[in-house]
Amino acid sequence: ESRQFICRVVRDIVSRYDIDAIHMDDYFYPYPVAGMPFPDDKSFQKYGLNKGYKVSQRAEWRRENVNKLIREIKRTILLSKPWVRFGISPFGIYRNKKSTPDGSGSNTNGLQNYDDLYADVARWVKEGWIDYNIPQIYWEIGHPAADYITLIQWWNKNATREGTHLYIGQNVARTMKADQLTRKMLYERSLSKVKGNCFWPANEILWNNKGVADSLKQNYHRYPALIPAYTHLHNRAPQEVKKLKA
């Protein structure tokens, strides 16, 4: 019922308004709080155990609940306006290396999308259920638990596919406090799969926190540019632009 309601809301927004995209942030299952387990025993009994899941498979069941939501939202958009994009801005760590039997996780030590929020972002990218992915890499270069460079390298290598754009979510206040804007911008531009940045929160740019807006305008965004093309959403080139004046 919850998925159906959310999809009805998405369908209403997409059909009534000329929007570019439906965007979701990092809220799937709640962020865990010590001593406060998520109260879904009755739901798991009805929709999990009664459907063939084992007691030990509650995590898999939760992940599949979220997978179904993402898949159904994408399908809802495709049936309404297939050119409208669907994107996610997940928490910045997919899985820590120590949590993955094959060592495929990042060399980090923090909360995890897959294990703690039950958000299998890498699968959504692989399956083409989202059109863009903006992991929130809000830490500094050299952070002991979640190093910025380690994480953007991981996302650039492990969670990309043709047709799903990768952008880096930047924390403006923390970046400027650490005086790392230049290093971050130059490094992410060296990665082949990264299409750009999204800066959070926007008011830090408007307030020009520690000169961030000036630096972006003068050094990194000096010239107008088109956003990267989402060619997988359509197979026709737009018509030639006419009546332009130099």
Model-derived features with residue positions:
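C-terminal structured "cap/appendage" subdomains that terminate the fold
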Residues: 172-195
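Alpha-helical structural signal in soluble globular domains
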Residues: 16, 72-80, 123, 127, ...
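Pro/Thr/Ser/Gly-rich low-complexity, intrinsically disordered linker/stalk tracts
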Residues: 211-246
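Alpha-helical scaffolding within the catalytic cores
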Residues: 108-125, 144-159, 180-185
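Hydrophobic faces of well-ordered beta-strands that scaffold small-molecule active sites
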Residues: 22-24, 86-88, 133-135, 166-170, ...
